[in-house]
Amino acid sequence: MDAAAVISLFILGSVLVTCSILLSSFSSRLGIPILVIFLAIGMLAGIDGIGGIPFDNYPFAYMVSNLALAVILLDGGMRTQASSFRVALWPALSLATVGVLITSALTGMMAAWLFKLDMIEGLLIGAIVGSTDAAAVFSLLGGKGLNERVGSTLEIESGSNDPMAVFLTITLIEMIQQHQTGLSWMFAVHIIQQFGLGIAIGLGGGYLLLQMINRIVLPAGLYPLLALSGGIMIFAVTTTLDGSGILAVYLCGFLLGNRPIRNRHGILQNFDGLAWLAQIAMFLVLGLLVTPSDLLPIAIPALLLSMWMIFIARPLSVFAGLLPFRGFNLRERVFISWVGLRGAVPIILAVFPMMAGLDNARLFFNVAFFVVLVSLLLQGTSLSWAAKKAKVVVPPISWPISRVGLDIHPENPWEQFVYQLGADKWCIGAALRDLHMPPETRIAALFRNNALLHPTGSTRLREGDILCVIGREHDLPALGKMFSQSPPVALDQRFFGDFILDAEARFADVAQIYGLDGGEEFREHQQSLGEVVQQLLGAAPVVGDQVEFAGMVWTVAEKENDHVLKVGVRVAEDEAE
């Protein structure tokens, strides 16, 4: 490749990335998932589009996509809270194993019938599209305000279900090449190997990487690069040993994000930009790889297969996978069924048959691409609507416009939060001494009209003021309510109820005040309101959990770890309003 070709490649790549970034602003206006825009730009630049670029380098696409996935999952793992694992680990693992098997089998049988393939080839299509995609889930669920149980289950499922899909795909390709029709006992061994090595190397390598970051003194800008290179190495080593590199890098990120780590906020800030770049590059390359004119002949059967997977296979697999977990109500199960988002992973898995030289490899790739496109357009665009209908959205809190870590020491948890006060904030006009600040938080600075003030307790807040608050991550919910829109309890009242009670209050006293019937066993044992709600829920509580009892609707309004702190209450008849 001569110098002119290299420069042309740089120009082409920068133009495509720039167009992707600029056009991403239309995503929210049009209600289209941003990943679809990246994919569409790649298709427009491809052989059938206005760019006319011929691209069929599958090994290169495989390399770029795997590198991008490693970056996205490392970033996603760092942002996953340990509390999410406590709430959703086992349900998510059930969906990642049993759920993927059921989805793949049902989708595969339908694919064999629709495309008139051998059953094993149909099952290969089912395996290729059988897992949800972490890049799509992390991108589309961000900022939706889902309750912790639902959001965490979907995120952990998407980060851990790829090993099963990858293993099924590779196994079925080998069976087709060797003309086998049955599975051997090695099937189970390989599954255990994928998960076992992924977990062991991910956590072990993540721990070693954490120690390295905390013990070596480097310029601040090098810590994100050290974390990135270490995560990619863990991904590559695990994959080389026939383990799940995707699971390993996700767990590595999870460990780094939930332990004290040097320059934590610098790492996260850099990872945010890198994850966006990875998503853009991955979907551009995958868009270039497809030939849109090849999708037209298979459009009808591929659309039918997509509908079968979305409306039949995915719901059946979710209901079966969540059967042992009674903490999920019907609305939550239905919503999780709907959010079976497909993205880059099925397209990457569809490259495997191309590289293996299977007879119908092009058909497998085109079907997988079509299914991903339908999933992103149908499920991705309706996500917000479905969440509201299923009532799995909790009232949002006001987040700071900026967060800066005070990285004095790896063990130091303190941060600076910056809030800008608009006219709709309830605290406008309030004196600083009247603000009920969370314990151990301090207002470090107050800016007004670009000037730094020296406030006193009598200083009153005005529209446009910028507050710098020193606190810790667990203070964000309380600070968010303090700087929320006016009136501060309006949304809480609509969602949680007319009154929010302390969970330590005795149920007997609450029942007497409200004149409630029933619950004699709780009164006799002098149980607190929080204990009663947790017992009725039968699962680890999350904010937004509701239970109807004694003619009232009780809603978890605040919790810490697995303990309920505040409970909202309203008359049950209000549900119908």
From Swiss-Prot:
PROSITE patterns: RCK_C (PS51202). Residues 403-485 form the RCK C-terminal domain. The chain crosses the membrane at residues 3-23, 30-50, 58-78, 95-115, 122-142, 185-205, 216-236, 237-257, 280-300, 303-323, 334-354, 363-383. K(+)/H(+) antiporter that extrudes potassium in exchange for external protons and maintains the internal concentration of potassium under toxic levels. InterPro entries: Cation/H_exchanger_TM, FAD-bd_PCMH-like_sf, FAD-bd_PCMH_sub2, Na+/solute_symporter_sf, NhaP2, RCK_C, RCK_C_sf, Transptr-assoc_dom. This is K(+)/H(+) antiporter NhaP2. It comes from the Bacteria. GO terms for cellular component: plasma membrane. Keywords: Antiport, Cell inner membrane, Cell membrane, Ion transport, Membrane, Potassium, Potassium transport, Transmembrane, Transmembrane helix, Transport. SMART domains: CorC_HlyC. Its main location: membrane. It is a multi-pass membrane protein. It catalyses: K(+)(in) + H(+)(out) = K(+)(out) + H(+)(in). It is found in: Cell inner membrane. The keyword Cell inner membrane applies. Gene3D superfamilies: 1.20.1530.20, 3.30.465.10, Regulator of K+ conductance, C-terminal domain (3.30.70.1450). One of its GO terms (biological process) is cell volume homeostasis. NCBIfam families: PRK05326.1-1, PRK05326.1-2, PRK05326.1-3. The gene is nhaP2. Belongs to the monovalent cation:proton antiporter 1 (CPA1) transporter (TC 2.A.36) family. NhaP2 subfamily. GO terms for molecular function: flavin adenine dinucleotide binding; potassium:proton antiporter activity.
